[in-house]
Amino acid sequence: MTDTTSTITSRRTPSTLAVWAIFAILFAAVQIASLFTPALLDDADASHAQAAQHMALTGDYVTLHVNGLRYLEKAPLPYWIEAVSYKIFGMTAFATHLGNSLALLGCTWLAWLWAGRAWGQRAGFYAGLGVLTAVGPFLYTRFAIPEALLSFFFLLALYCFLTGFESSRPLRFYGMWAALALAMLTKGLIAPVFFLAAALPLLILSGLWRRWRELKPFTGLLLFLLIAAPWHILAGLANPDQGNPVGNHPTIGHVHGFWYFYFINEHVLRFLGERFPHDYNKLPLSAFWLMHLVWLFPWSLFIPALIAAAWKSRKTWISQLRGNSGQTVDFYLDNAVRTDVASYIVGLKFRVRTTWLLSIFSVFTLCFFSLSTNQEYYTFPCWVPLLMLVAGIVASTEERRSFEGSEPRLSTRWLTYAQLVFAVVGVLVALALGWGLWSSRSLPYVSDIGTLLAHRGVGDYTLSMSHVFDLTGPSFAALRLPAILAAVALLIGPLAGWILRKMNRHLEATISVAITAAIFLIAAHIAFARFEPMLSSKPMADTLLSKAASSDQFIIYGDQADASSVVFYTDKLFHKPTLLVGERCSPYGVGSTMVWGSCWPDAPRVFISEQELVSEWGKGNRKWLFAQDANQQKAMQLLGSKLIAVQTIADKTLWTDRPLAQ
């Protein structure tokens, strides 16, 4: 299929200019407006930001460092992007998360382009709306993780792979190899593994494997290596094995270097659940799968229609995929009324191959992370393909076109029922929010929502959504504005959409889904920002910046991740690693991301014992001590009256060792 091949023209679909005007408004309202607040979050968000901060300040773009120690477990491209962003915009939350938002915009563009080419302009429009307004893509671009960038490169590689065969343009395949290399620099070995898991079955089932030379396997692989290999080689040379490491538990002076740690510990052993340290968790299988209804919401409501369409067309799955499909006498007779049967065949094949490729990629991604250790967002790369498939069936059903060129068409009742479910869900959620608002109506607004939350510790807080389960009735006192906004949107929007669907005004009904979701996401971001005292320690960093001297020492009782935002924001003041109360190179994995780096013989002094803390407290330069949750009691038992409280926020306290007047 050439670039000039006409695509299906969708009646009443907005023009390209109008579509991108809508996309721009949604992107600005949902993504850009949320880049400024909240501040960087403790744990992964600010820890990853520290690695990029070190790059920007030192110019070392090979070996990642966090709090002065080697941090070898991640691929570098996201940190390179953040470091460049820091150079341009300064070291802020905006600069940290801008790359994620731009990657999501790139996914929107590719979804619009690809779905529009496969199923028509309306499908492209809906695919873009889905990417910009689904819950999962919004939620997991709020902090510094590489999944949005990885999804963009995956989508680009798959699109270049498929269109390369359609257009017979070598540049498309070179684009595929380049995108794969960048994906590997984003997330590691899963890039080629996931791509091959989708591409190889399609090549075999469709017969395209006979055209394997067009893939440019030799020169393309060379391009892949030219892009991906240099950093891996340099990182390995800069971080070789130290001493005589044995097994997977390092000891001081005896630690595996980059090659083992990155490829074996972080890839193979993480998949098997044997990685050290064991600072991660795994969702129950049923929850892992069912939560995708949330990540793709509200567009997941149309998944039953997608499944129904796939079942109705099951008899043509393979026949339309093979190289000679559409070339029989019966096929030409059935389509004799078409003005250009050849173009129809080409378009049909592209649509069928798109469906297969996106489906295989999505299923493999879901199954892979069902077996391995996982976080909720690990399947992010398959969310955009699933949204594209949903957009294709919704648009085809609205326009009363047969799916994959076969009969029968899917009834629009499937869409009406989905809209009805959305309306029911909207009413129920609005009622729940209303109850929360009513029950907290007499409570005063409390800026520190952390004092109103229950600390239930779901998943021991190793899952990204653990804090959601800490919500209590009184916490609605701090969430009145976002709760009201979400309740109104969910009460009115879905009902209006259902009425429009009943009136056969399908385009307007589907747009109403996106508008409702966008307003809900804006409300969700306002609520998320209200959680800042609980999730970020930036106010304590501000206190240090205003009261501490550069000669002072900041100490964390516990893991660096507990106050990683303080470490990030105060780096410009202290210019030295934060001390951690704990065991260096702990055999039990205490210290999490700091463990491996602290085992290196040239590692700076970062860990101190409790005895050292007691002996040094109150002596020399001023000390500042941070402790969170259970560590607060430990610190108070250890130092007692020697602690001078400076600030308490949520479950975090900042102390110093002498009165501030001194």
Please give the residue ranges for each predicted region.
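Membrane-integral, polyisoprenol-dependent glycosyltransferases
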Residues: 2-407, 440, 572
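Membrane-embedded architecture of ER/inner-membrane glycosylation machinery
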Residues: 2-7, 16, 174, 309-324, ...
